[in-house]
């Protein structure tokens, strides 16, 4: 993949995360959807209007956009790479079977 292509993907991911952060930050605590455990892992999913979030431990590592059937893998953006969180994302991806998967990578 060329540098420009990855920069374009990173830009799309940052835009999607901006939408997610807006909804998350503007949802009152009493209206916050419950976290549901992913299999028997230290990972949870949380459904919001239009998207589902994957939390690995206490970090948002992926966002699935239900409208566009796109999975945004933000692990490397928010934390760096860990094998455990990558496994959580793989399970999450298999659960939703998205049409598109976009992965944030440093350029």
For each feature predicted by the language model, list its residue ranges.
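Terminal leader/tail segments of proteins
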Residues: 1-107
């Amino acid at each position: 993949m060329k540098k420009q292509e990855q920069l374009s993907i990173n830009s799309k991911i940052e835009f999607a995360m901006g939408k997610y952060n807006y909804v998350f930050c503007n949802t009152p605590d009493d209206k916050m959807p419950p976290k549901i455990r992913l299999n028997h892992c230290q990972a949870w999913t949380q459904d919001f209007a239009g998207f589902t979030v994957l939390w690995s431990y206490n970090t948002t590592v992926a966002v699935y956009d239900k409208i566009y059937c796109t999975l945004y893998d933000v692990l490397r953006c928010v934390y760096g790479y860990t094998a455990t969180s990558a496994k959580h994302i793989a399970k999450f991806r298999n659960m939703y079977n998205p049409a598109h998967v976009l992965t944030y990578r440093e350029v």
